[in-house]
């Protein structure tokens, strides 16, 4: 394993160092099957945000299907990796702080993949509150949620009770499905979930 100087996942330098040393065990190297089906089955293109986008393979897939999708990350090295993957549409990848970024138009969907579990547990209420701020009633929070009780991270796993407590004040869970194509770090511990923003 590579030696790292930065141990604070709330610092962009933490993620820069891992991308620069090519230590990215959370990177699937492609688009997960359940997301492929979700995008293909969507009756119309959606306006979507991918926070903490990493290499942003999903962004390419969404754009290819006509979605108005944007990916953000606060790590310059992650943004560079994502722009290399996205190519000619690199303008859809923005270096930004999720907690400060503002959409140009209302979002239909936020895609969750290894963003919540990248955050220390003390930050989770702020993440959930920001999701709720960015999504109007009826809009969706969709993606993969990592369930584990390991004290160390990232990834920081969540319990079902914790996730329910975080999201139930603002969201209704519409889907909760097993995942059969997880990469090693998430294998057997993640679920595909779809949450709908409820009116406050």
Positions of the model-derived regions?
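Class I (Rossmann-like) S-adenosyl-L-methionine-dependent methyltransferase catalytic domain
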Residues: 1-50, 54-105, 119-200
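A conserved beta-strand element that flanks and buttresses the S-adenosyl-L-methionine
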Residues: 111
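Short catalytic micro-motifs in class I SAM-dependent methyltransferases
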Residues: 114-118
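Conserved acidic residues
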Residues: 108
């Amino acid at each position: 394993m590579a030696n790292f100087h930065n141990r604070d996942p709330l610092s962009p330098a933490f993620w820069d160092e891992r991308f620069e040393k090519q230590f990215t065990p959370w990177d699937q190297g492609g688009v997960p099957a359940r997301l492929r089906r979700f995008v293909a089955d969507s009756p119309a293109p959606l306006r979507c945000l991918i926070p903490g986008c990493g290499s942003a393979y999903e962004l390419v897939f969404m754009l290819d299907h006509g979605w108005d999708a944007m990916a953000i990350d606060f790590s310059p090295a992650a943004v560079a990796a994502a722009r290399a993957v996205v190519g000619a549409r690199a303008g859809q990848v923005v270096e930004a702080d999720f907690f400060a970024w503002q959409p140009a138009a209302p979002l239909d969907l936020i895609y969750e993949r290894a963003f919540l579990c990248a955050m220390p547990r003390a930050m989770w209420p702020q993440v959930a509150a920001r999701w709720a701020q960015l999504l109007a009633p009826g809009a969706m929070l969709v993606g993969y949620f990592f369930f584990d009780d390991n004290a160390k991270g990232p990834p920081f796993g969540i319990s079902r009770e914790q996730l329910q407590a975080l999201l139930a004040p603002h969201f209704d869970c519409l889907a909760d499905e097993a995942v059969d194509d997880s990469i090693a770090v998430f294998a057997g511990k993640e679920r595909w979930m779809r949450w709908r923003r409820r009116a406050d």
